[in-house]
Amino acid sequence: MDIVERFINYTKFNTTTNKENGLEGIMPSNPTEYELAKFIKDELSSLGIKDIILQDNAILIAKIPANCENAPSIAFFAHLDTSSEQKNDTKAKIVKYTGGDICLNEEQGIYLKFSDNPELKKYVGDDIVVTDGTSLLGADDKAAIASIVNMASFFMQNPDVKHGKIVICFVPDEEQGLLGAKALDVNLLGADFGYCLDCCEIGELIYENWNAADCTVVFKGVSAHPMNAKGKLVNSLLLAHKFISLLPGGEVPECTEGKEGYFWVKELSGNSAKTTLKIDIREFDEPKFQKRLEFLSDMANSFNKIYGDRCEITLKTRYENVFKFLKDENSLPIKLAKDAFSELNITPNIKPMRGGYDGAAISAKGVPTLNLFTGGNNFHSVFEYLPVSSLKASSEVIKKIVINAAK
């Protein structure tokens, strides 16, 4: 089966992550994630792969045994769910790009504009998969699934090509805090290291990401009727605003870039009696990350001394920087990726990821995992698109990694 046909088949499953179910501990959060996993399981089985596990939580693990000695066992990861930014069914279509704007939906006047996407000039003459402008495409991360299954198909059809053990793993609910990867038992993999395919444009290669933590501060006020509140009412909402005002104003997402960390005040809810404030902490450098956590803890202690034990703070690490587990830029997983790019004449775009991905959770469990491109653009948007040449290149890269690792 052609890789594009595989991808479009996967987009027909509406696997929008369900945040409400996720918060309740339901996995997969959307039952269609399991349906897609079952579909892929059957597909892998039809290729001749015998060692396949599909768990009730939609985690799918398949293994292709090594056909040579002394080659590392390599895992390839993708996620089944799509972002909840848009929830409509995907209506994917292929267009031949000749330049200029791409009409996604003539009836509704929706266009993928060249002025907003100047990188399109690289794809003139290419086939591009787009939507009708009313949904996500789901290249994040179904392009990855297509790439990995296509790679598996190659090795099953070419048994004379030497390779180590290949592990395929698809997980649910990445889009709401790496839930599937956190639930994964890596002991079932038997992998030495791995690659997530969850980057965007062709050439992207990531082996650094945020250290991330969640901060929750609960402010306790004293309620009173406003007609006789003088000297009695303590408004927890105003306490929260005073706390926020103590944060460094320039260290926020909208004022930072590259490896600059931040505090993100992302949610404030409550009333005069009780208010909950949620803050995301992000930093690449581990010592700086710890200093941010200490800063918030010290700030809460000082606040309580001033206002009389009016706040309670909870700090929880969400995920860590993958580079911590890869050790250095000469590690085997990074070298194999760079060599594959070079042999395929793909210019690597190496950059720190101002976000997280499944590899962060998986690396912390003992399987160092970096992040490779899928070829898609404009993730989490109705203007998401996937150049076919980039999708094919993604699969060629991981195929080359497996072959080179066995040499």
Regions found by a protein language model. Name each.
Residues 10, 271-273, 348-405:
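Zn-dependent metallopeptidase/amidohydrolase metal-coordination segment
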Residues 238-255, 262-264, 320-370:
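Active-site-adjacent substrate-binding region
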Residues 51, 160-165, 249-264, 303-316, ...:
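Flexible, glycine/charged-enriched surface loops at secondary-structure junctions
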Residues 149-157, 242-249, 400-403:
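Short glycine/serine- and small hydrophobic-enriched flexible loop segments
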Residues 126-136, 173-297, 301, 310-311, ...:
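Midchain, well-structured core segments that form catalytic/ion-binding scaffolds
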Residues 70-162, 170, 393:
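Active-site metal-coordination/substrate-binding segment of hydrolases
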Residues 2-30, 130, 223, 377-381:
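N-terminal capping segment at the start of a domain
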Residues 21-71, 75-81:
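A non-catalytic alpha/beta surface segment that caps or lines the substrate-entry region
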